[in-house]
Amino acid sequence: MNAAVGLRRRARLSRLVSFSASHRLHSPSLSAEENLKVFGKCNNPNGHGHNYKVVVTIHGEIDPVTGMVMNLTDLKEYMEEAIMKPLDHKNLDLDVPYFADVVSTTENVAVYIWENLQRLLPVGALYKVKVYETDNNIVVYKGE
């Protein structure tokens, strides 16, 4: 007899995408001197760029028919719409309206991605967004 019959198994599914974007860390609430002190070289008036990596993790029940939490093709399309189209090869501060009034820190990039994905994914599916600004600078956001 199959021990899994009748069990409702749950799993987490993650997918990685990479995008390139530029930005400048600058808060209009701070003076030029304060911005330079807080953000250092990242406050360069001409901005700077990153090759971001984003890992999106969803969770849910494993469908007993398909064996999947979600079809990876669907997740890929959601991530294309929520991450790649609005952010890839963009100046975050100039090309993405969200960042007109929000400092484009990696924390806020993670929040932006979370909010975009929440609008597309089934309710309750999104578990976490992990954004690598560099290999050493990483933000994890779980909607909290």
Curated annotation (Swiss-Prot):
Modified residues (Phosphoserine): 18, 27
InterPro entries registered for this protein in UniProt: 6-PTP_synth/QueD (IPR007115), 6-PTP_synth/QueD_sf (IPR038418), PTPS_Cys_AS (IPR022470), PTPS_His_AS (IPR022469)
Keyword annotations from UniProtKB, A to Z: Lyase, Metal-binding, Phenylketonuria, Phosphoprotein, Tetrahydrobiopterin biosynthesis, Zinc
PTM per Swiss-Prot/TrEMBL: Phosphorylation of Ser-18 is required for maximal enzyme activity.
Nuclease keyword on record: no
SUPFAM superfamilies assigned to the protein according to its UniProt record, in alphabetical order: Tetrahydrobiopterin biosynthesis enzymes-like
Protein residues bound to Zn(2+): 23, 48, 50
Any matching Pfam family: PTPS
Pathway: Cofactor biosynthesis; tetrahydrobiopterin biosynthesis; tetrahydrobiopterin from 7,8-dihydroneopterin triphosphate: step 1/3
Propeptide: 1-4
Transmembrane stretches, start-end: none
Enzyme Commission code: 4.2.3.12
Cofactor(s) the protein needs: Zn(2+)
GO terms under biological process: tetrahydrobiopterin biosynthetic process
Cystine bridges: none
Catalysed reactions, as listed in the record: 7,8-dihydroneopterin 3'-triphosphate = 6-pyruvoyl-5,6,7,8-tetrahydropterin + triphosphate + H(+)
Keyword hit for Zinc: yes
Signal peptide limits: none
Subunit field text: Homohexamer formed of two homotrimers in a head to head fashion.
Disease in which the protein is involved: Deficiency leads to phenylketonuria.
Function, in words: Involved in the biosynthesis of tetrahydrobiopterin, an essential cofactor of aromatic amino acid hydroxylases. Catalyzes the transformation of 7,8-dihydroneopterin triphosphate into 6-pyruvoyl tetrahydropterin.
Family assignment from sequence similarity: Belongs to the PTPS family.
Name of the protein this chain belongs to: 6-pyruvoyl tetrahydrobiopterin synthase
